[in-house]
């Protein structure tokens, strides 16, 4: 005699129970932070560079994972004109808080900051490090 109790249930455990028991993988929710410097911001940028880097290293305090980040440069390939980040976060509010807390924002290096949700279509797969 089988231990089957009902449709899809064996030994008192259904297929649904197996699905509930599985570990849910967090899917990355990506955002782009696009920040442009003030025209006269190069000296201020240099002054707060170290604090900005520390802020990036501590992104997880804001529930944000920095996937990639870099300096936007003029066509000469060297002169900084802004910053760009791709971040993984639970929601836009976390990204906004993270961006507003950046020393470049707090010390007026950036003139404008835009945040956009980002739907990655190509490139290296991104696995969320958020729990």
Descriptions of predicted regions:
Residues 2-131:
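Conserved, structured core segments of small domains
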